[in-house]
Design a protein with these regions (language model features):
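A Zn2+-metalloprotease active-site environment signal
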Residues: 1-205
Length: 205
């Protein structure tokens, strides 16, 4: 299970990122009461995640990692907003619920299905978005970065920082871990390449 603790970031740093967040919402004309940013200490390193209700969690490690490159953090926040705007989390809840109900009807455990459905929300935190969903969120970030006078290459910078951070802490103790790391790096490298292509298009406009 994923474990979150209260943030240990200085209040001044949290306020700095919160100000960035509010600026993003204003620029994109998004409802500030719907989109909430939360800081948490996370035992699995630098990360950010979007929840169905519009909440976005950023870990202490990702804020620290991108402290010297605020544009990279903005690119990540836009990516997470993209997940919410495309309702990816809600779609995953719907898929999980439908699958749960199907199995419940097949095996006659309707009562147990209720508990599983209630657990679907927390399960989202442990389930990766599909590649198509990730691609849509990437595109949302690429498309909106220029609105802040930021090159789409900032997303590539963010992914590079994350890849290097997680590679440094990844413990490849067996073949399965090594395969997982390799697959993660391939996906990340694909994201970086796509982001740089957007950057070239941006320069040509």
């Amino acid at each position: 299970k994923l474990h979150f603790d209260p943030s240990e970031l200085p209040e001044s740093k949290q306020q700095e990122v919160e100000d960035q967040w509010q600026s993003i919402l204003s620029k994109l004309e998004l409802p500030k009461d719907k989109y909430q940013l939360y800081f948490r200490k996370f035992d699995m390193g630098a990360n950010a995640m979007a929840l169905p209700d519009g909440s976005i969690i950023v870990t202490d490690d990702i804020v620290t990692l991108m402290e010297q490159d605020p544009n990279a953090l903005i690119a990540v926040l836009l990516h997470e907003i993209g997940h919410i705007e495309h309702q990816h989390s809600l779609k995953m809840v719907a898929q999980t619920t439908a699958t749960t109900m199907l199995f419940a009807m097949m095996f006659g455990d309707i009562n147990g299905a209720g508990e599983l459905i209630l657990g679907a929300g927390t399960g989202l935190l442990q389930t990766a978005f599909s590649r198509d969903m990730e691609r849509e969120a990437d595109e949302f970030s690429h498309k909106n970065l220029p609105k802040f006078d930021i090159s789409p290459a900032a997303f590539a910078d963010a992914m590079t920082l994350l890849v290097n951070s997680h590679s440094a802490s990844f413990k490849s103790t067996d073949d399965e871990d090594a395969a997982t790391e390799d697959a993660t790096n391939k996906d990340s490298n694909s994201k970086i390449k796509n982001s740089l292509n957007h950057w070239l298009q941006y320069l040509s406009t």
